[in-house]
């Protein structure tokens, strides 16, 4: 587990997208025909559906963000509109690409992922991203955050396939820790309506070699990250690293998660962590 307080510094992880997606291509190539129909944590998706989603989203992002190709005009008036749009596009993409044979899908995935990695590596990390990270409450995000968000998407869906097929391999400090750090960036937004005395400190600790510590402090008008705190924390929430990604991506219900985490101090304050959902939909 990282000994540093996290949450403030940019996450530079463009180089990791290539590695994660190379592992995805290798994983898909290793599957037996029957394994493509195994159920994943996503209730409506089997392995082939998750693979189809990963192909759809990488092609969609290259088309829209890199190539500025928008074939459908949409009007977004609320966060609910964003969720509805994303859910519709995801469902449409899976419907199309789940029809592909594994060899065809894998070949397309390999080519698309190579282009995606090169694209993200070429971006100015501090320039404005085309799409903001909405689950963190942002209306404008820097490219580094959008790239980190992309890493969380690629990592957690691949992990769904690995869990379904009993093929571990990406829960390593170099690949998983940046994912956790990106997830945690949503904490100030999750706590935005939680009132507490100024100076109240919450500690989120993810245990295990891939984890870390995030200190969240109540300021006059908002919650914000701070460096390693000498102040006494009002609450410490400890989540095992094996569970954390599922908590933050709707991979486990809150009641089941609540039974597997440890909360020291103010329990009401700590349980709010379980409301962090680092995906759209």
Task: List each language-model region with its residue ranges.
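Short, helix-capping/interhelical loops that line the mouth of catalytic, cofactor-
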Residues: 1-12, 60-115
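An N-terminal domain-cap segment
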Residues: 2-49, 63
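Acidic interhelical loop/turn segments
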Residues: 29-40, 114-146
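Short, contiguous alpha-helical
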Residues: 37-81, 133-192
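Acidic/histidine-rich alpha-helical segments that form the ligand environment
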Residues: 84-127, 144-150, 200-202, 233-235
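A glycine-rich beta-turn/hairpin centered on an aromatic-Pro dipeptide
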Residues: 176-218
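Acidic/His-leaning functional-site neighborhoods
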Residues: 207-236
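C-terminal interaction segments
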Residues: 229-281
